[in-house]
């Protein structure tokens, strides 16, 4: 009795020591159990007067965080809770042992303090859920969150898919239904993996696509991102790869991933003007400034009507908050894929919503990519190659101006074919031209072209492309006047040497000028204008030579450079050369003239400046030693090999001595008429090459060209052999002309233009000037050897032996093309250089060809 009274009134007196000890032990046990189970610990003083409150405070209200249980009332930091499968149910009663209290309390004493304090009565808690229930609950939560994210991602993916004008509606509906049915995580991840692989396929620059697929299949996303960046990087920003690789944890990796994506886009975007990295940054603060509104509007649309570009506002592509990151990320990925795709539409496949390949290779697909909004209407069209509309007329004027120089080159090169006949006639010429002197009249021009090719490389670097071409006009006039007024063979040889020197310079500088001024979209067409005009010059020379003697023909040659000289004053220097000399403002004006006043030339100008900076860093003091490096020898040797087989096919011997060959053949057709026919075929074949060169491919045309030349040369050799040693072939007078026509046709579509085209495609940028000079000089050396020795070959081997020798060389050239020459059709210059020497080139290289007349 006394014990109960003392407990009720005392504040912790010594008379109630047993109960105090019991409560202390109870506190220790509760604290220890709470720590083991991960419960919150609340410090509270236990005493005999506040036993109920203390117990109610210490015990957790909800040990299991399930949705059906009310949330905790205490806002302390939540620690990770561990739910053990064998965890015993928590209850108050089992924690008190009988020996802890000397005087056991009654049932009323056990319940009264708690009720008096106003607290809830402690009852045994329900048993904890089993491990199966815990897993089911967690799966429901994850599926709920992932389902929302899945729907957002699918909607975003629908809004940023790639479409083409050729669309299979049936397959589209089927794939859309399949995508809608893929509502679980596994299906979405599987389709997303396919989308990533397909996207990597369209933009892979480094040929490591197999690694990408393998890594992605193994779910190593960090390594996949780093590897993919290496395959796409066109600016040497390898530090971005290290940004991912050096991440010490997944948290750090995800933390730096946005920065990586934004910076990677800047390193990959060839148009520079895109600000899509702001999509990943999740910030719109920069777009709020009025001063930058103009920067968000870029000319990135090019429909079929290129005269009506569309200006769009890139603010629509920016993310307003971090919550929009996942949604906007799909748009960013699609935009980046469009901006970095260098394989053009015929290399892409039509894709469904999830990026899976739908069917056939769309070889002739529309050359631009559309983003489709959710309502199916085009939101944005991006034409890959450039950001400016094609202002075609100024570029046509520039191409025509330099092509008139090619016409002069063609006329000068073909001059000896009709002129030597009248020059050797003593009734027309006041001086005697021996057979040996005649061979030098024909052979000294390519020898001088060799010297001009060597001098042309330094001249175009120091004087400029335009000024170098312009400087050849007056010497062309002087050389023709020297020949026209010649009173001896020496004056003719001097005139031919001066003309050949100018031809060597022009053969190098004309393609360089066009390659640096014409936009890629029209470079193939305008780049063949020099070839066409060169062949026109050959035709003009043949036609005029049929009724003019050698002196009058030379006067005509002196008049042809006059329009060429006038038009060259109207066109600007190449922006690339201005940038190399630090004249930024002049480069901007030149670009404005070439691209049009309405075009935004700043991105292209900045790209030229970056290319020049890269070229300056890679430049060495001794360029010739650079040519001997292993990586550079391979493309140089291929270019030299093509030049060798081009000239030793005998083309210049055929052109130089066409009239003489037909006279020796005893053809019933007049020799001058035959030369005109050959000139017409040569001219027509040029346009056939224009139609086929970007459709059939380089190697296919080389195969066809080589086979045609081999057959015709062997047949022509057989005809001359039968004429000299065999049966009468006078009734086959049409056969030489037929063989010549097929021979010229085959040469003009293959071995005529392609060696010069591939010289600009496969030679590395940093050695382009020196390597092109070497290749040009080698070409003229071969030309000189062939033209100078052709008459000697005919004298020693006979006409049949000379043609059979050329045919055998062409046959060997066929195997050279099969084994060593790469196919460059449809590939960017970066892809070609990576394949040839494992390096990516910055600047746009030359992709033009020397006219057939340059081969003389």
From Swiss-Prot:
It is found in: Cell membrane. Keywords: Cell membrane, Glycoprotein, Membrane, Phosphoprotein, Sugar transport, Transmembrane, Transmembrane helix, Transport. Residues 411-439, 494-496, 549-551, 657-672, 721-739, 788-800 are extracellular. GO terms for molecular function: D-glucose transmembrane transporter activity; trehalose transmembrane transporter activity. The chain crosses the membrane at residues 390-410, 440-460, 473-493, 497-517, 528-548, 552-572, 636-656, 673-693, 700-720, 740-760, 767-787, 801-821. One of its GO terms (biological process) is trehalose transport. Residues 1-389, 461-472, 518-527, 573-635, 694-699, 761-766, 822-856 are cytoplasmic. SUPFAM superfamilies: MFS general substrate transporter (SSF103473). GO terms for cellular component: plasma membrane. Disulfide bonds: none annotated. It holds the Pfam family Sugar_tr. It is a multi-pass membrane protein. Glycans are attached at residues 427, 549. Residues 133-142 have a biased composition (Basic and acidic residues). Its main location: membrane. The keyword Transport applies. Residues 1-29, 62-202, 326-345 are annotated as: Disordered. Residues 69-80, 170-180, 329-340 have a biased composition (Polar residues). The modification Phosphoserine is found at residues 247-249, 319, 321, 844-845. Low-capacity facilitative transporter for trehalose. Does not transport maltose, sucrose or lactose. Mediates the bidirectional transfer of trehalose. Responsible for the transport of trehalose synthesized in the fat body and the incorporation of trehalose into other tissues that require a carbon source, thereby regulating trehalose levels in the hemolymph. Belongs to the major facilitator superfamily. Sugar transporter (TC 2.A.1.1) family. Trehalose transporter subfamily. This is Facilitated trehalose transporter Tret1. It comes from Drosophila yakuba. The gene is Tret1.
